[in-house]
Amino acid sequence: MNVFLKSLGSLALLTLSSLANAFDLQQLSEQLAKPDVIHGQFTQEKHLRALPQPLISKGSFVLAKNHGLLWLLKTPLQQDYRISAKGIARRDATGWQLLPNKSAGAEQNRLFLAVLQGDSSGLQRDFELALSGDAQQWQLTLTPRSVLLKQVFNQINISGGTLVNTIELLETQGDSTVLRMQDSTAGQPLSDAEQHDFAE
């Protein structure tokens, strides 16, 4: 009986220890918010029910703390976007043009920014968050709270390590989008051109 109780005691201690060391949302937020600047490449796959093959687009991105996100689409067409606290802007021949806040994809782009910057408090306003894994390999599941978001998304799955690696958006109508962030680096400062893009 003594051995059994000791085993139970050891098990309880192990459980408490693992709970104390559990990777939580606060730690994830701090981890993702650490880098001042992140440069990387992305591949986006849009799976539409009506099409047998996904629509694939590729490009590069720059995420800068206190500035926002530059989303530079290279293929199948070239188009630059800037997502910041001011809203979403698209570059044309005359410079950056702010898009209407209710434009298609505006909510999705704001969501990307919150995810990449580790803004869990911002995400918690709109989603139930469930985190699993550890600092090196984690997965975050977002389930919409609001009626509006429930009309668009069933669920959003985000996974990564030091930085975000993959974002998967599962839409209510059966379509889905998978974003893969590749070759992300957090050591390089903003170039003069990038600083100019954020300042405009």
What annotation goes with each model-predicted range?
Residues M1-G9:
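Bacterial N-terminal signal peptides that target proteins for export
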Residues F42, L69-L73, I88-R91, L98, ...:
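Short hydrophobic/aromatic-rich beta-strand segments that constitute the beta-sheet cores
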Residues D92-A114:
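Acidic/charged, solvent-exposed loop-and-adjacent secondary-structure segments enriched in E/D, K/R, S/T
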Residues Q124-E128, S132-E200:
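Gly/Pro-enriched, hydrophobic low-complexity segments
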Residues L51-L55, S60-K65, L69-T75, D80-I83, ...:
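Structural recognition of beta-strand segments within beta-rich domains
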Residues I56-S60, D80-R82, L98, Q155, ...:
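Well-ordered beta-strand positions in beta-sheet-rich domains
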Residues L19-Q41, H47-P52, H196-E200:
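N-terminal leader/targeting segments and the immediate start of mature chains
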